Amino acid sequence: MVMEQAGTTSYSVVSEFEGTILKNADSFSYFMLVAFEAAGLIRFAILLFLWPVITLLDVFSYKNAALKLKIFVATVGLREPEIESVARAVLPKFYMDDVSMDTWRVFSSCKKRVVVTRMPRVMVERFAKEHLRADEVIGTELIVNRFGFVTGLIRETDVDQSALNRVANLFVGRRPQLGLGKPALTASTNFLSLCEEHIHAPIPENYNHGDQQLQLRPLPVIFHDGRLVKRPTPATALIILLWIPFGIILAVIRIFLGAVLPLWATPYVSQIFGGHIIVKGKPPQPPAAGKSGVLFVCTHRTLMDPVVLSYVLGRSIPAVTYSISRLSEILSPIPTVRLTRIRDVDAAKIKQQLSKGDLVVCPEGTTCREPFLLRFSALFAELTDRIVPVAMNYRVGFFHATTARGWKGLDPIFFFMNPRPVYEITFLNQLPMEATCSSGKSPHDVANYVQRILAATLGFECTNFTRKDKYRVLAGNDGTVSYLSLLDQLKKVVSTFEPCLH
């Protein structure tokens, strides 16, 4: 660690992104994410196979060539909005998991914050400004042709000299008080020479930095998208590529068995193929003849929530759906009740179904991967007093079973492609009458109460975010699923697995 002029008050800071704000100095896995999410499996594999070449270029100090090769393979032929979409919806989660809190402690104590990265600016800017509260982001600039496609080239000839010049232009006539850079002084941190004081990561815990009152935690990532669970380092990416053929076969077997076996038998058979269901609490008995059914109010983690609930109960419980694909409906082993988003019509549908028996509803209206619960719709509380809260959670190793940007019809397939998917179900006690609308409580009070007890059970936090908030952040729309023709759906499947034809 090198430190100069330790007494300087840090009102402005210029920090390198890779290896300083992020603990890991290697940006390869983030280009792999762009390749997979924006271009597809083939581009993902090509970039992985070029990793030894990229590593050799780095070792022999051809760092600009290594960077340009990564950028070219990951981005050529894409439209810039596709890269922006990945940077908005996918990358922030992986960046946040790698943020050095010691660096953040120093960075956040300064009033003016500048981030310098060798990656394309479009890949970093949104995260840096929204989550790290950076004022400026200096990175490489992608060249886009007149047809709107990225050429895979960048405007900078010498990336590090360009960064130095742009930092100097940003602080014309004055010097930034503090510079943060990689552990060793390299060409990529030559902008530190402009700073009155500079520190090399790792930042010491007892470093006396700036204005302590300005420190804030990074804005958490509540919504994120993308299919990959783990950051695709070269080793992880290779394992994923090797697993995919076996995963597809395993998913087909699991889905077939789920369709032909009795519901009560599925949890036992699933253990043979690596699945596991953990049940806590006491499930209620089926409703007696002539009595209205129980409304199971579940947290919403994946499309499989109501299906797994039916497996555990050993009987088919219809599920209220807000917006799912036709393929998901076809594959579902339980009946689905599609809502219209017209309040009176939906209320009548739910009441009618409850008169026949039990029903499952997920009042968040959409899934959330992080340990947060979205705002609960209060409609369910108006329609019945027989409410059983159910806390649902799941763990997967390779692939997420939800998407906001992709085709939802592949959600169950990706779920069953995981080697050892685990579901946890906790049945809470049925709400007492004094906690329902029958005692004079408002539907919103009941919904908020159910949200709180479910969040407490899972160790999650309650939020006021809605499905519209989620889809506006991740996909730039309101989350409505359109019903495509069979040809359009097949095109979507092909584009998911082979979208390298840009």
Swiss-Prot record:
**What is the membrane topology listed in the Swiss-Prot or TrEMBL record?**
Multi-pass membrane protein
EC number(s) reported in the record: 2.3.1.15
Q: Show where the record puts the motif HXXXXD motif.
A: 300-305
Q: Which reaction does it catalyse?
A: sn-glycerol 3-phosphate + an acyl-CoA = a 1-acyl-sn-glycero-3-phosphate + CoA
Q: What is its main location?
A: membrane
Gene Ontology terms describing biological process = CDP-diacylglycerol biosynthetic process; suberin biosynthetic process
Pathway the protein acts in: Phospholipid metabolism; CDP-diacylglycerol biosynthesis; CDP-diacylglycerol from sn-glycerol 3-phosphate: step 1/3
Q: Which domain of life is it from?
A: Eukaryota
Keyword Acyltransferase in the entry? The reply is yes
Entry GO MF terms? glycerol-3-phosphate 2-O-acyltransferase activity; glycerol-3-phosphate O-acyltransferase activity
**Distribution of this protein across tissues and organs:** Weakly or not expressed in roots, leaves, seedlings, developing siliques and flower buds.
Q: Which SUPFAM superfamilies match?
A: Glycerol-3-phosphate (1)-acyltransferase
For whether the record's keyword set contains Acyltransferase, the answer is: yes
Q: Which UniProt keywords apply?
A: Acyltransferase, Lipid biosynthesis, Lipid metabolism, Membrane, Phospholipid biosynthesis, Phospholipid metabolism, Transferase, Transmembrane, Transmembrane helix
**Would you name any one GO CC term?**
membrane
Q: Where in the cell is it found?
A: Membrane
Residues spanning the membrane: 31-51, 237-257
Tell me which family the UniProt entry assigns to this protein: Belongs to the GPAT/DAPAT family.
> What the record says about its domains?
The HXXXXD motif is essential for acyltransferase activity and may constitute the binding site for the phosphate moiety of the glycerol-3-phosphate.
What the protein does comes down to: Esterifies acyl-group from acyl-ACP to the sn-1 position of glycerol-3-phosphate, an essential step in glycerolipid biosynthesis.
The protein's name is Glycerol-3-phosphate acyltransferase 5
